[in-house]
UniProtKB/Swiss-Prot annotation:
Belongs to the ETF beta-subunit/FixA family. Heterodimer of FixA and FixB. PROSITE patterns: ETF_BETA. Required for anaerobic carnitine reduction. May bring reductant to CaiA. Keywords: Electron transport, Transport. The lineage of its organism: Bacteria, Pseudomonadati, Pseudomonadota, Gammaproteobacteria, Enterobacterales. Pfam families: ETF (PF01012). GO terms for biological process: carnitine metabolic process. Pathway: Amine and polyamine metabolism; carnitine metabolism. This is Protein FixA. It comes from Escherichia coli O17:K52:H18 (strain UMN026 / ExPEC).
Length: 256
């Protein structure tokens, strides 16, 4: 069985700075990391290897220059996948969910798969669209919000979803796309042995042309800025007489 687990490289929020001049966010010094939600998908895929005979897990990502980072590749492979496929092209730097899903679907078809796992959303945008779009593009079942995988056979995956007032159990025919929630597991921290072994695992680097992808730019430039900080006036009203109460009420009306 071939299991693909998709992931996205996102900026490390600890490295994002705010420009004091205009309040815009500066990502120039932010290192890339695996989206937190995709760590759950990677962990789930590797746990499924224990349920499926001769299962192989392939990590897959599409993106820009962040995917060229050797440290980032090793981080992914140290978490259990048997191999890594990255599709690198400048046009993926600002791809919208539709373009990302189209590229992932094309890459998955080229690689071959029985099951595709991904996180419910990404740590940076959390659009919660890509997984379902991949299923739609491939014309296969797609389920999101999965909080537990019960069993896996050669042709069926049984999962649970936590709804508002009940737990839903679904049997999904394969091939399929499943987007998992953070409730599904707690991603393990790779051991030193796993980190060293990651360097020996195969990595395939594809271009957009390799998967037959050539989309026109479909994004719009928007400003991302920190909220404006309002300077406190530090008005202190001393006393509890009628004049002080009236002054307090007047100042309160100014900010409501």
């Amino acid at each position: 069985m071939k299991i693909i687990t998709c992931y996205k490289c996102v900026p490390d929020e600890q490295d994002i700075a705010v420009n004091n001049a205009d309040g815009s966010l500066d990502f120039s010094k932010a290192d890339a990391k695996i989206s937190q939600y995709d760590l759950n998908a990677i962990e789930a895929a590797c746990q499924l290897k224990q349920q499926a005979a001769e299962a192989q897990v392939t990590a897959l990502s599409v993106g820009g220059k962040a995917l060229t980072n050797a440290k980032g590749r090793k981080d992914v492979l140290s978490r259990g996948p048997d191999e890594l496929i990255v599709v690198i092209d400048d046009q993926f730097e600002r791809a919208l969910p539709q373009q990302t899903a189209t590229a992932l679907a094309a890459a998955a078809q080229k690689a071959g798969f029985d099951l595709i796992l991904c996180g419910d959303g990404s740590s940076d945008l959390y659009a919660q669209q890509v997984g379902l779009l991949v299923g739609e593009i491939l014309n296969i079942p797609a389920v999101n919000g999965v909080s537990k995988i019960i069993s896996l056979t050669a042709d069926t995956l049984t999962v649970e979803r936590e709804l508002e007032d009940e737990t839903e159990t679904l049997s999904i025919p394969l091939p399929a796309v499943v987007a998992v929630s953070t409730d599904i597991n707690s991603p393990q921290i790779p051991s030193m042995k796993a980190i060293l072994g990651a360097a020996k695992k195969p990595v395939q680097v594809w271009s957009a042309a390799d998967i037959g992808f050539n989309a026109e730019a479909a994004w719009s430039e928007q400003q991302v800025a920190a909220p404006k900080q309002r300077e406190r006036q530090r008005i202190v009203i001393e006393g509890d007489g009628e004049e002080q109460i009236a002054a307090f009420a007047e100042n309160l009306r100014k900010v409501i």
